Amino acid sequence: ALVGKNSEKNNQNLMQLIRRAHGLVENPDLEKHRQSQDHIGELLGNSKEIQYRPVDIDGMDAEWVSVNRAHMKKYVILHCHGGGYSTGSSIYARTLTSKLAAGTSMDVLCFDYRLAPEHPYPAALEDAVAAYQWLIGEKHYEADKIVIAGDSAGGGLALALVMYLRDHGMDLPAGVLVMSPWTDLTNSGKSYQTNFNRDPQFGGTTDNMLFHSTYIGDADPENPYISPLFGSFEQFPPILFQVGSEEVLLDDTLRVAEKVRKTHGKLRVTVYEGMFHVFQMALRLIPESREAWDEVSHFLEIIYCIERKKEGKTVKRVKSGRERSRREP
């Protein structure tokens, strides 16, 4: 589905601000880049209604994000942060994790997986598996009460994690939510060319993490655990894909979605016209971002069969046979 187009003039300043803030094209010092991202997360994720609690997962830092009000503690979202596998953290991800928690009334766990180039593949995937197993083994969540989410590289990691769980006979989550996922580290999609001069973040230059990934290391970039595009999506839980029409990563979403359709899997794909990479970080500043967050909340309500009353309370709804037969949530 295509969703409305906000004028380029209205978005131009915001796009340039985000581009400069993240240092995506300027290729700054890596450690300074990581530190500046944490500062952004601390600033933009500052909210009185959100509580951030540090968590240790067998030596791996993580952050538990929850709202300071009554919420649904039986459900949890496992969020894989973005950053090209070489930057990003749970603090940087607060812009998204705080909104996930506030908009869904669910707890969110974001973990600090090891970063490249210090730790190439399979470090991030190993840490994602560890975080998922920790939720089940230590926090005693049932797998069907977990949704795996991710943005950008974290979106690709979320899909790779579900592949790994399926391939190793582990219980699968209730659903997957990915924003602008990086699913093809070979950069083979047509949108890498067609949107090259349109993407306000990654376009116009090859001097950025998309074209110089240090995560691959000595591995095959077509390994599905690195580039989920090249894997199988059989037996996947329902997936929500959100992507902007201007992204060089557009085909990373569309090509994966087509593979999911061929398996008769349940999915929803929304292309937000005129939007840039992980535009959801704009929160309520632009209408497309507001609509995307509303879609996220609705998707999770469908996944968990929840009806939300006007006063904010939730009730569990029983699926009918007709509803169980629907392909698309």
Could you describe each region identified by the protein language model?
Residues L17-L24, G45, Q51-P329:
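Alpha/beta-hydrolase superfamily serine-hydrolase fold, recognizing
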Residues A1-K9:
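N-terminal membrane-anchoring alpha-helices
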Residues E8-P54:
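An N-terminal hydrophobic leader/cap segment in hydrolases
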